[in-house]
Amino acid sequence: TTAGAAAMVNNFPAQDAFIVEKLKAKGALILGKVNMSEWAYYFCQGCPVGYSALGGQTLNPYGRRIFETGGSSSGSGVAVAANYAVAAIGSETSGSILSPSGKNSVVGLKPTIGALSRSGIVPISSSLDTAGPMTKNVIDNAILMSALIGEDKRDRYSYQASPIRFDHLDTVSLKGKRLGLNSKFQKDSLMQRAVTAMKSKGADVISFDPPEIQMYP
């Protein structure tokens, strides 16, 4: 409701966001709100990742002031990684769920646009914004995602997504699956162990060097 900005400190919405209503209806306990990169990092260029005027600097629990938190859903990733909560909600326009999930070793999912309602979320792009679940493992992520889906008439992109299937989560095979691996991550010992494990299950892991992306001036 504030996007971490002092300008929004007195922004008190009249009703819960649709996804919060869904969680409460299913018995979830809402522990609170967490910090984020101010204005989802879009209107605060040059600000440290994970910093906001209202919340200060979010720190990575695996190495405070050593490792970045990722952003903009910095607090969501940190809260799950530090076991403050079993699950958290992030939002993403471009990388804001996936980045803090990777930096804090949690599971993050950016759903298809419209699968989750965006009502109540400070908007950046109507065609790119979405909320998404952030958890410690895939099963918890699927459970949270299942609780969040539903059509919201307040969001014109919203639709009734198909139910999440749980019956095959423990039987999915990696045999024959082709997975891309950014070559710059290959030196990391944990990544090497993960790659070895995936290959042992039949995955074809293909190393690649991604091209540099020319940023806007």
What do the PLM-derived regions correspond to, one by one?
Residues 1-2, 41-46, 98-103, 120-121, ...:
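Short acidic, glycine/serine/threonine-rich loops at helix termini
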Residues 93-119:
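Glycine/threonine-rich beta-strand-loop-alpha-helix active-site module
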Residues 29-33, 86-90, 98, 107-108, ...:
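Structural recognition of the beta-strand scaffold that forms the well-ordered cores
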